[in-house]
Amino acid sequence: LFVRKPQIPILIDRTDNILVEMRVQAHKGDVLNKLSLQFKEGIDLNDIKALRFFYSGTEATSRQGKHYRPVSYISSHAEGKTKAANPAYSIKQSEVTDIANVVTFTSNQPMVEGVNYYWISIEMKPEASLLTTFTVQMPMAEINNMPATIVWDGKSDVRRMGIGVRHAGDDGASAYRIPGLVTTNNGTLLGVYDIRYNSSVDLQEMVDIGVSRSTDKGQTWEPMRVAMTF
């Protein structure tokens, strides 16, 4: 079982974030029956709303290399679809809402011959702090009810939180691009960006300049304001 943790922020405002993603080279009918995750480094487990274990199918034989997902599990650009897992590639196997230091997931999904993909999603509670950090390990996994060898791709890195200040489709705009961020003398955060109403493409298009403001170090953001129109 090959396991990787992508080094991207966990967005508090998302329903699903990639916590770990997995690849299994299987024979037809093999089953990844069980696996466990262990949280370390003092995370407040009450900040976690849910953990979900997904099966994501197989791989095209023509695609070369060692990958950890067949597609992007959560879109960064599809309007209204940037906060939750793509259901076409995320078949839920189990979900845990009673979060403990060690969490166990189960599955009865038969795998196909060749490469099979899985991933675990994490959803934070809205009140979770942006300062939250944690690491996670996988102490155990079973395939066909037998212990599986777990191979990590990279070290056990610290994961951090973030907020999606703007998402595709917010306020009726197709995309937001070219961001900037400044801190004023009194600590207020100002985020600026293109508001691309019709598509994410470059000029020539209908584009305004938007501003978002936070007075609590990025934990919450005021409604968007249009700073410049063209």
Regions found by a protein language model. Give the residues of each.
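Exposed, polar/acidic Ser/Thr-rich sequence context and nearby capping/turn residues
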Residues: 1-160
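Asp-box/BNR beta-propeller blade signature and adjacent active/binding-site loops
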Residues: 58, 89-94, 114-119, 123, ...
